[in-house]
Amino acid sequence: MRWESGKTRRQEDDSPWVDTHVHILPPRRMAGLVRWVKKFTPGFPVSEDITSDEILASIRDSDIPYFFNLVFPLWEEETEDLNRFNRDLCADIPEAIPFGSVHIETPDKGGETRRCIEEYGFMGMKLHPFAQRFPAFGPEMRPMFEVLNEHHRPFLVHTGFDVFYGMYMDLEEMEATVRDYPDMQLVAVHAVFPRFKLVHRLLAEYPNFWLDMTNSISCMRLYEDIKDNRDNLPPMATSLEMDDVRENYDDFFRLFEDFPERIMYGTDFPVGFGYHPALLDDLRFFGFSRDVEEQLLFKAVHNLLSRCGHPDTLASLEGI
């Protein structure tokens, strides 16, 4: 079942999994997120009333030793409160690695970013430009980029799935941002799905460019299941960009051959394509080598945090 928590380390030598994409939000925002997912996922079993404790219990049931907790304001006026929420929440959760966020209308983006990094101890910042309804790489965001570049910190940004969202991202601006802020580590969340040829080139050209394969692994497995039966597509598959996936198919596998040390694997938990055991099965469907699997599950995260000056964050994990 896709929606059952359970162990992901079933054998003693199974790799630990650092989940780089979790959303524990305030109750009102959590309920709104679940309601949104239910609009396009018939039978989605997660309750709108799911609590932080329930999310955390499932994460722990699935043997997740660390996770990135990601927030982002939909309105400017919730920015400071949302970042304080993440600070207070994660202060009591040793597994949590918090990220902050800003809104395009946040008056002092540099100041809020500095507060998140220097005062709250956050690892970096996150934007979801499609949900927040503003461009991620315009000049308005430069104050945030400058602080992240100064501190060598990561910027996680939603990329890809343009057809599903009915929106467009300027990928030339994204590349310019990677180039202009070489000490800021830019993590393309969802790996600009399905533009794998592009991200392969960016990984080759820019050492500060990284991928998080959240949802993209599951979508590629879905593609494998339905590519020969396009007249009977399941919910959501109509926006899978089948033709583009086919054109980028070989490049998907080249990513793991050439750059596994900069590719991570998050889940969007609890509103992704399933709970942790099912999403681990999606990864293993492709039969990657043990070394590649270890990179995706925890070693690439360690590489990222080490690049950001925090090599000891995951030091307790075996194999680091």
Where in the sequence are the language-model features?
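Alpha-helical scaffolding within the catalytic cores
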Residues: 50-56, 81-86, 109-112, 171-174, ...
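Mid-to-C-terminal alpha-helical segments outside catalytic/metal-binding sites
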Residues: 1-20, 29-66, 115, 250-254, ...
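Catalytic pocket-lining loop regions of alpha/beta-barrel enzymes
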Residues: 123-124, 137-264, 318-320
